[in-house]
Swiss-Prot record:
Residues 1-7 form the signal peptide. Expressed by the venom gland. Glycans are attached at N25, N229. Keywords: Allergen, Disulfide bond, Glycoprotein, Hydrolase, Lipid degradation, Lipid metabolism, Secreted, Signal. This is Phospholipase A1 1. Its EC number is 3.1.1.32. Belongs to the AB hydrolase superfamily. Lipase family. It catalyses: a 1,2-diacyl-sn-glycero-3-phosphocholine + H2O = a 2-acyl-sn-glycero-3-phosphocholine + a fatty acid + H(+).
């Protein structure tokens, strides 16, 4: 079957006319993980109350939302590895957001790249969905906003940003932190703060840049880490280099969760200091503890080609 589109599929009128990628709450599925329950069962907004965690009157665990990017899913191995690393590190409630139906990559896998603009058009709606779940956590389960952190890759980074904007509109306050893993560049590079992930979307917004084409070189957060100058990651071959570099952001962050050594961010300048001379007042470790370091701004991060990727044994003096 041949599907042909005439006009701009990013236009809301065109999307409505063709129903390319219709959004509803049922197009977003969730996996809830804790140390006690690691089953990758899918839940919807209507069925989430069946999970043991939501049979409680109060949820005391810190909450981490993980949102995948275009053409991916919550069960993709890199996100499963991230969730496992988080559960090993702390007693979290992890909410893995699966929005592949809203990106049309589930129904039309062979044509998935045709639907990028349609997926972009649904990012704010998926963000609003996450905000709705956050509202439920705060109001029904007494989870403080300071206990909620969002992690998103590529389009998932912008989805997380839109969720951060929406909870503020709902007068819930700000999320503790949003971590954008190589936020998608196409359709977002020139957008102002209201139309992309932005430093005002949470109390602390951490951005990892790993691909200059699929991602963006633009500063977006409280801290922006330009890993290997933000492009051409070591160990990524030329032919699939951009996709590999784009995905490396997820792998880097997972290693930062999993291991004691950190990826060290050195303040960007014409003559950046070597990581061997980094101090806690000048440099920042990428990862869950980044906001404990006082420095803000843009940082250069040297990495190795293989895991655990850290340079200088990941030590700050």
């Amino acid at each position: 079957r041949l599907i042909m589109f005439v006009g701009d599929p990013s236009s809301s009128n065109e999307l409505d006319r063709f129903s390319v990628c219709p959004f509803s709450n049922d197009t977003v599925k969730m996996i809830f993980l804790t140390r006690e329950n690691r089953k990758h069962d899918f839940y919807t907004l209507d069925t989430m109350n069946r999970h043991n965690e939501f049979k409680k009157s109060i949820i005391k665990r810190p909450v981490v939302f993980i949102t995948h990017g275009f053409t991916s899913s919550a069960t993709e191995k890199n996100f499963v590895a991230m969730s496992e690393a988080l559960m090993h590190t702390g007693d979290f409630l992890i909410i893995m957001v699966d929005w592949r139906m809203a990106a049309c990559t589930d129904e039309y896998p062979g044509l998935k790249y045709m639907f990028y603009k349609a997926a972009v058009g649904n990012t704010r709606l998926v963000g609003n969905f996450i905000a709705m779940i956050a509202k439920k956590l705060v109001e029904q389960y007494k989870v403080p906003m300071t206990n909620i952190r969002l992690v998103g890759h590529s389009l998932g980074a912008h989805i997380s940003g839109f969720a951060g904007k929406r909870v503020q509109e709902l007068k819930l306050g700000k999320f503790s932190e949003i971590i954008g893993l190589d936020p998608a560049g196409p359709s977002f590079k020139k957008n102002d703060c209201s139309e992309r992930i932005c430093e005002t979307d949470a109390h602390y917004v951490q951005i990892l840049h790993t691909s200059s084409n699929l991602g963006t070189e633009r500063t977006l957060g409280t801290v922006d880490f330009y890993i290997n100058n933000g492009s051409n990651q070591p160990g990524c071959r030329y032919i699939i280099g951009e996709t590999c570099s784009h995905t490396r952001a997820v792998k880097y962050f997972t290693e930062c969760i999993r291991r004691e050594c950190c990826l060290i961010g050195v303040p960007q300048s014409k003559n950046p200091q070597p990581v061997s001379k980094c101090t806690r007042n000048e440099c920042v470790c990428v990862g869950l503890n980044a906001k404990k370091y006082p420095k803000r701004g843009s940082f250069y991060v040297p990495v190795e080609a293989e895991a655990p990727y850290c340079n200088n044994n990941g030590k700050i003096i």
